Swiss-Prot record:
InterPro entries: DNA-binding_RecF (IPR001238), DNA-binding_RecF_CS (IPR018078), P-loop_NTPase (IPR027417), RecF/RecN/SMC_N (IPR003395), RecF_2 (IPR042174)
A biological process from GO: DNA synthesis involved in DNA repair
Residues bound to ATP: G30, P31, N32, G33, Y34, G35, K36, T37
Subunit structure: Co-immunoprecipitates with DarG in the presence and absence of darT.
Parts forming coiled coils: none
PROSITE patterns: RECF_1, RECF_2
Protein name: DNA replication and repair protein RecF
Assigned GO CC terms: cytosol; plasma membrane
Gene3D superfamilies: P-loop containing nucleotide triphosphate hydrolases, RecF/RecN/SMC, N-terminal domain
Record flagged with keyword DNA repair: yes
PANTHER family named in the record: DNA REPLICATION AND REPAIR PROTEIN RECF
SUPFAM superfamilies per the UniProt record, alphabetical: P-loop containing nucleoside triphosphate hydrolases
Amino acid sequence: MYVRHLGLRDFRSWACVDLELHPGRTVFVGPNGYGKTNLIEALWYSTTLGSHRVSADLPLIRVGTDRAVISTIVVNDGRECAVDLEIATGRVNKARLNRSSVRSTRDVVGVLRAVLFAPEDLGLVRGDPADRRRYLDDLAIVRRPAIAAVRAEYERVLRQRTALLKSVPGARYRGDRGVFDTLEVWDSRLAEHGAELVAARIDLVNQLAPEVKKAYQLLAPESRSASIGYRASMDVTGPSEQSDIDRQLLAARLLAALAARRDAELERGVCLVGPHRDDLILRLGDQPAKGFASHGEAWSLAVALRLAAYQLLRVDGGEPVLLLDDVFAELDVMRRRALATAAESAEQVLVTAAVLEDIPAGWDARRVHIDVRADDTGSMSVVLP
């Protein structure tokens, strides 16, 4: 798989650009702040419908405009597929597949399969649980695009249920008991969609675990052994150890956990149980990586998580596109060499670098130089001829 064309309109610092890309390695070179990462971000958005840098879409739209467009042509086994994504201010985002409108942007997920390595990856080890949950969900969505709808529906139900919890004090004051009947309805829906999301994550962690261990050993052979596990906000004993996860059992346990925390939730006005409270646990030896891993160990573990994702996608069938955003600058010589070796099998590798010295020695790659120009509308990124 490779991206043959990337077109941007009013995306971040890019007013207008059309890039013809090729299989093999391409390096986007330019000083920091010139817009290199925005190219990688656009491709990652096309992969997961989300940015790896911000949680909202608004910052992706160029200042002074009301919409951004990302256009890609992806080649997979000789077959071309065109995707256009429109990110809009104040209205629903739109998508087209092979120039035809689709019902939801989620319908284009899976066309581009990519793995992203970025400086933000250190947050997978040292950051909040939300960073690790997003890692799992993004990978699950790339492998099984239907998970995007599951997550979206879970988040919708979670918002509705949280709003209802916050309204309970007022309902009690008015003597309105119907709010509790409504809460039970939302409990059932949260348990249904939450169980499906948790099942997908547990299944993914079970497959990732041996790959993370192998990748970390390659990157840090002198360090302790790496391991991962899934920590849920409810009892998942049994299902987490099974290859065929019982979603009905998970839903029943989630429903029971919601009932057990009902009083605390009503008091605080927040949902205390569900996949939005879960975490991916990372360990080195018998210690949690967060707080105990050195800087080098943390980077090795972060890269190992991405390499494990890459390996799973390869096993699924087809080489995913590798997106390397300034990551070589963050790694020492040994880790650079290990990552470069792993990238050799990819059909396409797209890399950003502030200076060419950040690229591993001996890497044969096309070079695309990025600059910044100014006009009446402000500064914008451009590709140098």
